[in-house]
């Protein structure tokens, strides 16, 4: 997410855009570059995306717990969500239930992907950004309180954020 116009577009300096493109090209794939326009727009896009990601992990953990406690097999519930309107990258790759998605951190002892403590930081940035532009971030304000508690829980500290599953379900750490 780049706070600059794409080379050849907008009012930006083509020389600057070309330079940015060249430098970033050494670090990643151009098809993964999102030229967001003016300075700061790339950061706004990143904060918006992280706002969604942080709330999704919490919502997925709560929804999976609800379904499992109602007797639904965790893998079946994941398949239902994957093939329905609840499908998301986070549900498919960061599902917080151990054993549901083999490559997910939860299936690998919550081996670090993105720390629980960082979830608090990122959702906090989202709350601040929303308020700055006149949006009432009601969902994120509720979510950040849960994330703060999980970030202080020894079962979640310095583990992937999907370890919030342990906190929400009060599961003893093995």
Language model regions located:
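Rossmann-fold dinucleotide-binding core
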Residues: 1-54
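Hydrophobic aliphatic residues
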Residues: 24-28, 81, 168
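Hydrophobic alpha-helical segments
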Residues: 170-174
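Helical "substrate-binding/catalytic lid" subdomain
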Residues: 41-167
């Amino acid at each position: 997410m780049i706070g600059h116009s794409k080379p050849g577009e907008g009012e930006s300096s083509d020389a600057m855009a070309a330079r940015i493109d060249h430098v970033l090209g050494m670090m990643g794939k151009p098809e993964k570059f999102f030229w967001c326009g003016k300075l700061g727009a790339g950061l706004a896009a990143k904060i918006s995306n992280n706002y969604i990601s942080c709330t999704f992990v919490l919502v997925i953990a709560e929804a999976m717990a609800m379904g499992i406690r109602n007797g639904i097999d965790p893998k079946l519930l994941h398949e239902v969500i994957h093939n329905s309107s609840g499908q998301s990258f986070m549900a498919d790759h960061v599902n917080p239930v151990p054993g549901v998605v083999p490559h997910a951190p939860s299936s690998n002892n919550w081996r670090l992907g993105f720390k629980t403590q960082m979830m608090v930081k990122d959702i906090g940035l989202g709350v601040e950004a929303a308020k700055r532009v006149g949006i009432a971030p009601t969902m994120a304000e509720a979510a950040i309180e849960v994330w703060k508690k999980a970030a202080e829980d020894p079962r979640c500290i310095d583990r992937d954020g999907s370890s919030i599953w342990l906190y929400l379900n009060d599961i003893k750490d093995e």
